[in-house]
Amino acid sequence: MTISPPERGEKAKPIYDQPVDRDHVPADFEKFEQPGFFSKSLAKGPNSTTWIWNLHADAHDFDTHIGDLEETSRKIFSAHFGHLAIVFIWLSGAFFHGARFSNYSGWLADPTHVKASAQVVWPIVGQEIMNADVGAGFNGIQITSGIFQMWRAWGITSETELMALATGALIMAGLVLHGGIFHYHKAAPKLEWFKKIESMLQHHQIGLFGLGSLGWTGHLIHVANPTNALLDAIDAGTPMVLDGKTIATAADIPLPHELYNADLVGQIYPGLASGIGNFFSANWWAFSDFLTNNGGVNPVTGALWSTDVAHHHLAWAVFLMFGGHVYRSRFGIGHSMKEIMGNVKGDPLLFPAPNGHKGLFEFLSNSWHAQLAVNLACIGSGSIVVAHHMYSLPPYPYLATDYPTVLGLFTHHMWIGGLMICGAAAHAGIAVIRDYDVSVHVDNVLDRMFKARDAIISHLNWVCMFLGFHSFGLYIHNDSMRALGRSQDMFSDSAIQLQPVLAQWIQSLWASSIGTSSVVGTTTGLPGAVSDVFNGGVVAVGGKVALMAIPLGTADLMIHHIHAFTIHVTCLILLKGVLFARSSRLVPDKANLGFRFSCDGPGRGGTCQVSSWDHVFLGLFWMYNSLSMVIFYFSWKMQSDVWGTVNSDGSVTHLVSGNFAQSAITVNGWFRDFLWAQSSQVLTSYGTGLSGYGLLFLGGHFVWAFSLMFLFSGRGYWQELFESIIWAHNKLKLAPTIQPRALSITQGRAVGVTHFLFGGIVTTWAFFHARLLGLG
């Protein structure tokens, strides 16, 4: 990557005086009509079928188009606006479906009995069978995205408001799309502007996250929470009275602009009518009715208290706006990221690096791949954390009792997190190859890490072997003992126990904090400081379990160690791809070959699965396998030990009658009692409203199996086949101008892994949906 030098004789100006170049690149739409315009070789057009694959591979590889960091930065920045435009169009579509094709009002009136639907299938050749009865006289496809619950939490009470949001989102899409064009063609930021790290941190922390969170707090306090308080009162059977009028239905709720009337909203939350003077006089307790610290969940909706959520966003806004002011930018005061990072020394005992983190700031501020790798790893991990909070601390009303939606959101956030973490490894590998200068990084933490890579990878390897042999060994033992009829010799809760004592201890610690004054500022005991999944009680909403304690036993410990094994192997593959991206014993010149390189050319025998790209390719399979185990475990565990109906005597009838603890301790149990038994709904879905999932189940299997054709067979076989066919065509003078050529091994693997993941995800989607929607 090269950095453009300033023009000769040009005096450097402060970036604040001239942060952009005007009319940088004229918008030339004719250029976009030429495929491959960004590459001299691709612009010549195809002479073989490899051209189309290279076109796809390089279209967004901005580094290789010009090789100039400033131009690359501008393209990425402009593409961000395009991405935002697509997001707004997608949001507009969701709002529009809610406004025109949904039963949102019907669901809002009776969320415990009416199911969410925002799509109606047109009757072309019998597809209308998929429009099942979701309650209250509405027929459509049941949706499991959680948007109804989210809209309810936002305070949306009608389809009219949804249509207004759909229109607003389209307007925003147009604005940001224009912004992307403007900031590339009309006012393109300079490289120095992109590299003002402290200013960027201020903009993100104060502007985007701080003020964004504060603005959302304002919406929650003034619109969403009063609306939700009225809806909760209706659902609880005790409607509130405002100005002498009983608020009996959602249609009676005042419109958002009417809720700005202090006298009106003060009847819901008196603190809102007390005035802003209490803030400046530090009488903050006057606001304690709409900024609460209740803990636990609202017993009416089974969701976090909306007033707790508002308090949470206000606290984050304060933290972020304060934190965003500690960096040094225009005024020469505050923290310098370069100084902070440069002053950090390595661990003198475990990881001696005489130069510590020196050079790390320059690496991160010159390599967008390195920054992206860090961001993807953090956001991916955050997505996985969100997945676990969706069921343990449900944020939206009536989400916890919509079991298909909870499972769908858990699965979605787990997969998104896994893909992002694999993306982090990919971009870390690219950063190491394209942006890492070995002459600059001498005896700093990066250099020491690369020098210690053999020790790091070998230790990870030993950990993986230990976990793999022992965790699978427990399963092999149990399957063997069960086959021999020796249940007393099995590892189980009723024989040889392997209790997860540490996890149980942590659960008891959290449970013991309920009713204590463990949160700063509270004088009374918290009724539910933590989630009820930690040894709490049963929270029932509409006769269904919203939350209850999740018991842990031998089966959980065994599966936990299977998770540990698969996650460590994924980490091993991805990390090895990064640490050995520049060189290895087999291929010492990898840095010159690039992130991906073919392994089927002259002199390249035996070099497959050596490039950094190949490690991402393999890591994706292990990521998929490890997360499949996670989501299968979650699905079965919740159906067996948590989800179900609450009987009049307080007992719970679970969906699958608690068979998890005894069946999940053998491989055969997983096959028989989970995969086979729970696939009955999808296998018998034909002729019902779930028939679409039956077809998706078959189609997903087909796409998955199709991937194996690319993954199992060698390139040489296909090339020989092609050449035989081409020879026959030449004989008949029918040879095509564009020469057919077999996919390279890298291209074949890319096609293979894409279909493997897509087919597997669709199959799992159909399996989960048909199962829980079929159970009703």
UniProtKB/Swiss-Prot annotation:
The chain crosses the membrane at residues 76-99, 162-185, 201-225, 309-327, 368-391, 407-433, 455-477, 557-575, 615-636, 690-712, 750-770. Its EC number is 1.97.1.12. InterPro entries: PSI_PsaA, PSI_PsaA/B, PSI_PsaA/B_CS, PSI_PsaA/B_sf. One of its GO terms (biological process) is photosynthesis. Gene3D superfamilies: Photosystem I PsaA/PsaB. One of its GO terms (molecular function) is chlorophyll binding. It holds the Pfam family PsaA_PsaB. It is found in: Cellular thylakoid membrane. It comes from the Bacteria. Divinylchlorophyll a' binds at H701. GO terms for cellular component: photosystem I; plasma membrane-derived thylakoid membrane. It catalyses: reduced [plastocyanin] + hnu + oxidized [2Fe-2S]-[ferredoxin] = oxidized [plastocyanin] + reduced [2Fe-2S]-[ferredoxin]. It is a multi-pass membrane protein. Divinyl chlorophyll a binds at M709, Y717. [4Fe-4S] cluster binds at C599, C608. Phylloquinone binds at W718. SUPFAM superfamilies: Photosystem I subunits PsaA/PsaB (SSF81558). PSI electron transfer chain: 5 divinyl chlorophyll a, 1 divinyl chlorophyll a', 2 phylloquinones and 3 4Fe-4S clusters. PSI core antenna: 90 divinyl chlorophyll a, 22 carotenoids, 3 phospholipids and 1 galactolipid. P700 is a divinyl chlorophyll a/divinyl chlorophyll a' dimer, A0 is one or more divinyl chlorophyll a, A1 is one or both phylloquinones and FX is a shared 4Fe-4S iron-sulfur center. Keywords: 4Fe-4S, Chlorophyll, Chromophore, Electron transport, Iron, Iron-sulfur, Magnesium, Membrane, Metal-binding, Oxidoreductase, Photosynthesis, Photosystem I, Thylakoid, Transmembrane, Transmembrane helix, Transport. The PsaA/B heterodimer binds the P700 divinyl chlorophyll special pair and subsequent electron acceptors. PSI consists of a core antenna complex that captures photons, and an electron transfer chain that converts photonic excitation into a charge separation. The cyanobacterial PSI reaction center is composed of one copy each of PsaA,B,C,D,E,F,I,J,K,L,M and X, and forms trimeric complexes. Belongs to the PsaA/PsaB family. PsaA and PsaB bind P700, the primary electron donor of photosystem I (PSI), as well as the electron acceptors A0, A1 and FX. PSI is a plastocyanin/cytochrome c6-ferredoxin oxidoreductase, converting photonic excitation into a charge separation, which transfers an electron from the donor P700 chlorophyll pair to the spectroscopically characterized acceptors A0, A1, FX, FA and FB in turn. Oxidized P700 is reduced on the lumenal side of the thylakoid membrane by plastocyanin or cytochrome c6. HAMAP family: PSI_PsaA. This is Photosystem I P700 chlorophyll a apoprotein A1. It comes from Prochlorococcus marinus (strain MIT 9303). The lineage of its organism: Bacteria, Bacillati, Cyanobacteriota, Cyanophyceae, Synechococcales.
